[in-house]
């Protein structure tokens, strides 16, 4: 499917349940890889080992003392990602959310934007997800191009000194990172825990 066969418009009320499921599916595809990446870093392994050792004095089961800290840590990572990306945000200062729609009317992607925290930060992508049945068909690039156009228009209307778009990407989402780098984005910082990055932020001056 060529990108020219796609249109982008604001989500309709009757489409919101479908879009919400798309967002949840997108998070589910990456949360296990992010959790694995986070919990195999040396500081995390050290903390898990210390927690397991402490629990062995409280719990009668060695296996439970070993697995409980891992289960709780994985759950915390998953809940954090779901809270951040697994819900449909309300309309923001840049409008939206928007959906990518095929000519047949099938919703195949979702996008949401928000202004940056400080003046000059530009716009931020807060949601970007493509249905697993429509990936590698130009949907992500079409949504990204639409986001860039909205960011430029918003920056001009607000008198911002520059038009800029920031896209956060989970560390395990190599396909999205590759697409952004191919479109001229550069990784600049991110956030995580214990000194290790879990989400990288890609930015581009438009």
From Swiss-Prot:
It comes from the Eukaryota. Residues 55-206 form the N-acetyltransferase domain. The chain crosses the membrane at residues 57-77. Keywords: Activator, Acyltransferase, DNA-binding, Membrane, Transcription, Transcription regulation, Transferase, Transmembrane, Transmembrane helix. It is a single-pass membrane protein. GO terms for cellular component: membrane. It is an enzyme of class 2 (transferase). Pfam families: Acetyltransf_1. Its EC number is 2.3.1.-. It is found in: Membrane. One of its GO terms (molecular function) is DNA binding. Belongs to the camello family. Probable acetyltransferase. This is Probable N-acetyltransferase 14. It comes from Macaca fascicularis (Crab-eating macaque). The lineage of its organism: Eukaryota, Metazoa, Chordata, Craniata, Vertebrata.
């Amino acid at each position: 499917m060529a990108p020219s066969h796609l249109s982008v418009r604001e989500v309709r009320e009757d489409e919101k349940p479908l879009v919400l499921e798309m967002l949840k599916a997108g998070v589910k595809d990456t949360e296990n890889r992010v959790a694995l990446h986070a919990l195999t870093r040396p500081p995390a392994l050290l903390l898990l080992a210390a927690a397991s050792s402490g629990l062995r004095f409280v719990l009668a089961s060695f296996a439970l003392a070993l697995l409980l800290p891992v289960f709780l840590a994985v759950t915390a990572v998953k809940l954090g990602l779901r809270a951040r990306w697994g819900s449909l945000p309300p309309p923001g200062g840049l409008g939206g959310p928007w959906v990518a729609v095929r000519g047949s009317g099938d919703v195949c992607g979702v996008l949401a934007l928000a202004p940056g925290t400080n003046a000059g930060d530009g716009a931020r992508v807060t949601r970007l997800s493509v249905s697993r049945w429509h990936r590698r068909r130009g949907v992500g690039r079409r949504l990204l191009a639409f986001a860039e156009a909205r960011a430029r228009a918003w920056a001009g209307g607000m008198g911002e000194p520059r038009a800029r778009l920031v896209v956060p990407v989970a560390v395990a989402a190599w396909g999205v990172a590759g697409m952004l780098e191919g479109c001229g984005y550069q990784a600049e910082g991110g956030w995580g825990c214990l000194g290790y990055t879990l989400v990288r932020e890609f930015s581009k001056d438009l």
